Structures are given as C-alpha cells and as structure tokens.
Amino acid sequence: MTITDLVLILFIAALLAYALYDQFIMPRRNGPTLLSIALLRRGRVDSVIFVGLVAILIYNNVTSHGAQMTTWLLSALALMGFYIFWIRTPRIIFKQRGFFFANVWIEYNRIKEMNLSEDGVLVMQLEQRRLLIRVRNIDDLEKIYKLLIENQYLKI
C-alpha cells in the first residue's frame, strides 16, 4: 500500500464521517427536531470540477496500468463526492434552543435581526455574521416564521 492509497483512504474516511454525521447524528443532537427544511444547493461548479478531476485520475491510473487498489479507492472517492454534492440535500434543522445551518449550531438568542429579500432569501443577522437562507420551497419561509413566532424566539 502506497502513501497515495493511505491519503485516499483518509479522504474517503473523512467524507464518510461527514456524510454519517450530517445524515444521522446532527438531526439527533440538541433535542428533538421541531422543523427540518430543505435548502437550495449552492453552485455545483466546484463539485463538477472535483468529480472531473477524480475521473481524470482514474483514467490516468487505468491507462498507465496503475495499482488496482488505487483505482478502486479513486472510484470510492468519486462516489462519495457524487453523494455529498448531488444526492445529499442541505437542510436547516430547527430545535428547541437553536438551529443547525451549514452544520453549525446557532442559538436563537444570537439572532439580532431578520429580513426577507425580494427574491425569497431569508437573511438572519447574527452578532458578526449574516446568514443567507435560501429555501427550496418558498412556502417553507412561512413555516419558519410560524415556528419562531409560536415558540417566541422572534420578538415582534
């Protein structure tokens, strides 16, 4: 096993750990889920570049009669990239005391201001950061509003 194979195994393990955390562990952290909303994906250009570069590496390894183990590891890396970038759906998960956005826990008391832009983007201003929440279904913005009002996280 070469150093290249070890690095590939490390990257595959890291992507697998991230996928498991995102799919199974994060929704169970910090209490029961009150609301889970699907978000729009950001640009897929980065993902196309990543999967394309891995495909080039697979092609190069096969044509130069490289190690079969490396080809399999590169294929596994390409599949993990495909899952994370195209199959997995980004979500915002609302809990009792806060919410997960981009895998980061944010307490409700950190929200200083909320606005809705003309194109349907919910803007939450935190102490030093601005969150741009782009929901997949525009009706989900009303669900978020109702949740925040009913639980009195948002003061009118």
Curated annotation (Swiss-Prot):
Q: Which UniProt keywords apply?
A: Cell inner membrane, Cell membrane, Membrane, Transmembrane, Transmembrane helix
- In this entry, the parts of the chain located on the Periplasmic side of the membrane are 1-5, 66
Q: Spell out which residues lie on the membrane's Cytoplasmic side.
A: 27-44, 88-156
How is this protein annotated for GO cellular component? plasma membrane
Q: Where in the cell is it found?
A: Cell inner membrane
The family database entries (InterPro entries) matched by this protein are listed as: DUF986
Q: What is its main location?
A: membrane
Tagged with keyword Transmembrane? yes
Membrane topology note:
Multi-pass membrane protein
Per UniProt, what is one Pfam family of this protein? DUF986
The superkingdom of the source organism is Bacteria
Q: Which residues cross the membrane?
A: 6-26, 45-65, 67-87
Q: Which HAMAP family match?
A: UPF0266
The record's similarity note reads: Belongs to the UPF0266 family.
Concerning NCBIfam families, the annotation shows:
PRK02913.1
State the name under which the record lists this protein: UPF0266 membrane protein YobD
Tell me what gene encodes this: yobD
